[in-house]
Amino acid sequence: MAKFELPNLPTADDAL
């Protein structure tokens, strides 16, 4: 999971 300096939001990467 590529976690950048962004808030914990439901992204496509998180759905995987």
Curated annotation (Swiss-Prot):
Keyword annotations: Iron, Manganese, Metal-binding, Oxidoreductase
Acetylation in keyword set: no
UniProt remark on cofactor binding: Binds 1 Mn(2+) or Fe(2+) ion per subunit.
Its cofactor is: Mn(2+); Fe(2+)
What induces or represses this gene?
Repressed by acid stress.
Q: What is its EC number?
A: 1.15.1.1
Which reaction does this chain catalyze? 2 superoxide + 2 H(+) = H2O2 + O2
Name one molecular function that GO assigns to this entry: metal ion binding
The source's superkingdom equals Bacteria
Q: What does this protein do?
A: Destroys superoxide anion radicals which are normally produced within the cells and which are toxic to biological systems.
Quaternary context: Homodimer.
Which family does the entry's similarity section mention? Answer: Belongs to the iron/manganese superoxide dismutase family.
What's the protein here called? Superoxide dismutase [Mn/Fe]
Protein's organism = Bacillus cereus
